[in-house]
Swiss-Prot record:
GO MF assignments: rRNA binding; structural constituent of ribosome; tRNA binding
Species of origin: Chlorobium luteolum (strain DSM 273 / BCRC 81028 / 2530) (Pelodictyon luteolum)
Record GO biological process: translation
Role according to the record: One of the primary rRNA binding proteins, it binds directly to 16S rRNA where it nucleates assembly of the head domain of the 30S subunit. Is located at the subunit interface close to the decoding center, probably blocks exit of the E-site tRNA.
CDD domains, alphabetized: uS7_Bacteria (cd14869)
Domain of life: Bacteria
Record carries keyword RNA-binding: yes
Keywords: Ribonucleoprotein, Ribosomal protein, RNA-binding, rRNA-binding, tRNA-binding
Protein name listed in UniProt: Small ribosomal subunit protein uS7
Cited HAMAP family: Ribosomal_uS7_B
Ribonucleoprotein in keyword set: yes
InterPro entries: Ribosomal_uS7, Ribosomal_uS7_bac/org-type, Ribosomal_uS7_dom, Ribosomal_uS7_dom_sf
Amino acid sequence: MSKKGGYKGVQVDHRYNDESVARFINAVMLDGKKDVATKIVYDAFAIIGEKMVDENPLEVYRRAMSNIAPVVEVRSKRVGGATYQIPMEVKPSRRGALAFRWLKQYATKRGGRSMAEKLAAELMDAASEQGASVKKRDEVHRMADANKAFAHFRF
């Protein structure tokens, strides 16, 4: 029997009491600097609260995550000397991880403001089904749709 305890999971976020926000903070974190990542995410939520007065920043965040998260993706499989792109359904944990990764990636690529402002802008765009991260999700869905013919090669 193992002496170590199992995986305890992510602690909920102390301000919004939400596990998804805590996971997002961990995704934004660089080089183990969690305080910096927490400040960036909370400042982004504050900016969303200022710009979208009638909406709760947490609801904007949730709507953005559901708009970014992919349902299907393509995976490569080698069959008889040829490599096929096979459309596969994305597991819920991977959906969230991809959404976090794309949101962080495209927020970082935005113009030269603070990271909190760039993250807030990308979240607001994603909540209204615009922005680069939503385009990335649409591109992944288009690739899966284009390769439907190879769906019978499933793993």
